[in-house]
């Protein structure tokens, strides 16, 4: 395998030419490895190698297009610089259109060759640095150890190198919007706007406004089935342009096949997403992620609330692992925050003291539990009613009525 000290992989079937180029490039300070056949050379290229390929365009059994296809099977961003004779210029031009870095016509101008090599190496180092940053970011910030999570990170890293449209689908709280946000943050359009809209029949007519706001960035549309066929065709046309004005991300609860079967997505838009749809699994499908996620959100909540991180008893941890978590990560994060302030996060968890008491009517138990939940929410948000209502996902008026019922005052929780 080539290490990163070797910066140029040189291919030419003429040994004398190979030696001449090798000598010239080594005198210029580059580490070169020469090969007389591209198939042999390909075996020496490791993943994320920081070098480039410099090759003759016409060799027995291998054209410039063949060579580019061979090397781009594993990494379509590996720079390939072609050297061509006069009669092979059309082939070299075609190869550049299909992804080769550039080409030089024989006789080669050494000065121009060195400039192209340095530009290609600079670009290559930038690509590898971004990949490493993406990998480290996703490893640290996307919590989980399941096989699905490993594949999710890898898929996001791969797609972040493109600006192609992506479809995320699954239940609420499974990471659909998180995936969309990381695609933007780690992608080519990271400096552009991140525009997100939950489409409804009422706002679908504002699509052009959403598109204008997303220029140069990422447009995330939840429930694109609310768009008319004409609007869907328009989105598909924009994504088919050579230079896409923005990255399109679709978010839904169903797969594209299910959307198509229900006649909710136009064929043109379907094919924009067809190769890049990502199924986001529920927590019940990836139980290996539950414990690390709970511990992550517990530490996060304790840091924000300035509380010590409590120990998680073995039985409680077993209960957390057994729970289905129907609202997925969102529900798990809320449970971790409640545990940070002393509330056991499982609805089925019973206070041992209650087992020694006479049976309590169900309505009273429900009221006691509701009062406890509201009390803890007031503690967490220090009596700020808007935040408490949003946290509990109930209207402010309903929250005030419940507080009045249980004799709770927001003033007692402000500190």
Swiss-Prot record:
ATP binds at residues 170-177. It comes from the Bacteria. The modification 4-aspartylphosphate is found at residue 56. GO terms for molecular function: ATP binding; cis-regulatory region sequence-specific DNA binding; DNA-binding transcription activator activity. Residues 385-404 bind DNA. SMART domains: REC. InterPro entries: CheY-like_superfamily (IPR011006), Homeodomain-like_sf (IPR009057), HTH_Fis (IPR002197), P-loop_NTPase (IPR027417), Sig_transdc_resp-reg_receiver (IPR001789), Sigma_54_int (IPR002078), Sigma_54_int_dom_CS (IPR025944). The gene is pgtA. Phosphorylated by PgtB. The keyword Ubl conjugation does not apply. Residues 7-121 form the Response regulatory domain. It is found in: Cytoplasm. This is Phosphoglycerate transport system transcriptional regulatory protein PgtA. Keywords: Activator, ATP-binding, Cytoplasm, DNA-binding, Nucleotide-binding, Phosphoprotein, Transcription, Transcription regulation, Two-component regulatory system. Member of the two-component regulatory system PgtB/PgtA that regulates the inducible phosphoglycerate transport system. When activated by PgtB it acts in conjunction with sigma-54 as a transcriptional activator. Its main location: cytoplasm. One of its GO terms (cellular component) is protein-DNA complex. Residues 142-341 form the Sigma-54 factor interaction domain. The keyword Cell wall biogenesis/degradation does not apply. It comes from Salmonella typhimurium (strain LT2 / SGSC1412 / ATCC 700720). GO terms for biological process: phosphorelay signal transduction system; positive regulation of DNA-templated transcription.
């Amino acid at each position: 395998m080539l290490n990163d000290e070797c910066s140029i992989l040189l291919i030419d079937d003429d040994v004398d030419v190979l030696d001449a180029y090798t000598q010239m490039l080594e005198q210029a300070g580059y580490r070169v490895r020469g090969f007389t056949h591209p198939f042999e050379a390909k075996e020496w290229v490791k993943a994320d190698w920081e070098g480039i390929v410099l090759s003759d365009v016409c060799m027995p059994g291998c054209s410039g297009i063949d060579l580019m296809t061979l090397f781009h099977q594993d990494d379509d961003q590996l720079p390939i610089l072609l050297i061509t004779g006069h009669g092979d210029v059309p082939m070299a031009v075609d190869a550049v259109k299909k992804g080769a870095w550039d080409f030089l016509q024989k006789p080669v101008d050494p000065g121009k060759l060195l400039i192209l090599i340095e530009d290609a190496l600079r670009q290559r180092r930038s690509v590898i640095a971004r990949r490493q940053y993406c990998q480290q970011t996703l490893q640290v910030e996307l919590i989980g150890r399941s096989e699905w999570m490993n594949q999710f990170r890898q898929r996001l890293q791969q797609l972040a190198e493109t600006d192609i449209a992506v479809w995320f689908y699954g239940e609420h709280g499974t990471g659909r919007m998180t995936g969309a946000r990381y695609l933007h943050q780690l992608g080519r359009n990271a400096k552009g706007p991140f525009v997100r809209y939950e489409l409804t029949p009422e706002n679908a007519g504002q699509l052009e406004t959403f598109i204008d706001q997303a220029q140069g960035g990422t447009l995330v549309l939840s429930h694109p089935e609310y768009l008319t066929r004409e609007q869907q065709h328009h989105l598909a046309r924009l994504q088919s342009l050579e230079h896409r004005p923005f990255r399109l991300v679709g978010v839904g609860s169903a797969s594209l096949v299910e959307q198509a079967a229900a006649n909710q997505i136009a064929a043109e838009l379907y094919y924009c997403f067809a190769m890049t749809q990502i199924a986001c699994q529920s927590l019940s499908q990836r139980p290996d992620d539950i414990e690390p996620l709970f511990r992550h959100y517990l530490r996060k909540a304790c840091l924000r609330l300035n509380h010590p991180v409590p120990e998680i008893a073995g039985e409680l941890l077993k209960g957390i692992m057994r729970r289905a978590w129907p609202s997925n990560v969102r529900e798990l994060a809320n449970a971790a925050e409640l545990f940070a302030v002393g509330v056991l996060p499982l609805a089925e968890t019973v206070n041992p003291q209650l087992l020694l008491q006479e049976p309590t009517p169900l309505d009273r138990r429900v009221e006691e539990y509701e009062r406890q939940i509201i009390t803890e929410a007031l503690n967490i948000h220090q009596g700020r009613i808007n935040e408490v209502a949003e946290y509990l996902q109930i209207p402010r008026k309903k929250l005030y009525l419940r507080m009045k019922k249980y004799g709770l005052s927001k003033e007692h929780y402000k500190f």
